[in-house]
A protein has these predicted regions:
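Membrane-interface anchoring segments and C-terminal beta-barrel signals
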Residues: 127, 134, 157-246
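Outer-membrane beta-barrel pore domains and translocons
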Residues: 107, 118-120, 227-231
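Hydrophobic, lipid-facing positions within transmembrane beta-strands of outer-membrane proteins
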Residues: 98-104, 111, 200-205
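Surface-exposed, extracytoplasmic segments of Gram-negative outer-membrane nutrient-acquisition systems
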Residues: 1-95, 103, 112-192
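Short, well-ordered loop/turn elements at secondary-structure boundaries
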Residues: 97-99, 107-110, 219-221, 227
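Repeated loop/turn-to-beta-strand initiation elements of outer-membrane beta-barrel proteins
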Residues: 110-114, 212-213
Length: 246
């Protein structure tokens, strides 16, 4: 991650697009040992307002990037405190920085076809905050499909009062535990997905009627055409995972 910049500020000669900012996710706490090692190795004293004893497996791990701002405007190095004010990194530009649009065409015996193709890439977008946090009270809301129980971290088997298994332990899950959304739903690189897309914007099929035919109708020339707009679009399927519900 690039750190040689004025933190979240415009600088001379740089883009006016400050981009998307958030914490840098470096993993997930999957055991109590992970928590102990992270705090010891990085000299962490405060993790998003929590002490080590308050941190739980199933929470995402964020990197301590910098300390407080200094009188000269720069920031101190990592200070053992992870918070959303001083430890953000640039996750992406606001829009894809690269792209192209091209027009193609062909014609044969009065029949022609033209098409406009476009693509953009190099940027990222974030899953909506409501999707990251579980949409409020999960007992009364439909959930995005990526929160399938098979994908969510569970430290140990969970049973109801009658001894029935409700959730099976899943320490190798892809996604963190929903119970800790105050930590896991923070804007971070974990929720960053590619914003690359390609689209077939327009296709026009046209036919020029034979002059021998139309001159009998008193017309010099005539052309019939059919145009389709926004026909095909390819983009990151993760957004569809958000739109679909369990």
């Amino acid at each position: 991650w690039e750190t040689e910049y004025l933190y979240r500020q415009l600088t001379k000669g740089s883009r006016t697009d400050l981009g998307l900012w958030g914490l840098q996710c470096i993993g997930m706490f999957r055991s109590n040992q992970d928590i102990e090692e992270y705090f010891a190795d990085n000299n962490i004293t405060n993790y998003l307002g929590m002490s080590k004893d308050q941190v739980r497996p199933g929470m995402l791990i964020y990197k301590d990037i910098r300390g407080a701002q200094q009188p000269d405007g720069t920031y101190a190095g990592p200070d053992g405190i992870v918070n959303v004010d001083n430890d953000q990194v640039q996750l992406s530009n606001r829009s894809n920085p690269y792209g192209f649009t091209t027009n193609l065409g062909a014609e044969w015996k009065g029949l022609s076809i033209t098409a406009q193709l476009g693509a953009s890439w190099g940027g990222y977008q974030l899953l909506p905050s409501d999707a990251r946090s579980g949409l409020g009270n999960i007992a009364y809301n439909n959930m995005p499909s990526f929160w399938n129980p098979d994908n969510m971290y569970v430290y140990q088997d969970i049973y109801d009062g009658s001894g029935n298994l409700l959730m099976q332990a899943n320490r190798g899950a892809k996604y963190p535990n929903l119970a800790y959304s105050s930590v896991n739903a923070v804007t971070s690189s974990f929720w960053r997905i590619s914003a690359a897309r390609a689209q077939l914007s327009r296709v026009t099929l046209a036919y020029t009627l034979p002059s021998a035919f139309i001159k009998k109708l008193g017309v010099q020339n005539a052309r019939i055409s059919v145009t389709g707009q926004n026909l095909i679009s390819f983009y990151n399927h993760c957004l569809m995972d958000f739109l679909e519900i369990l």
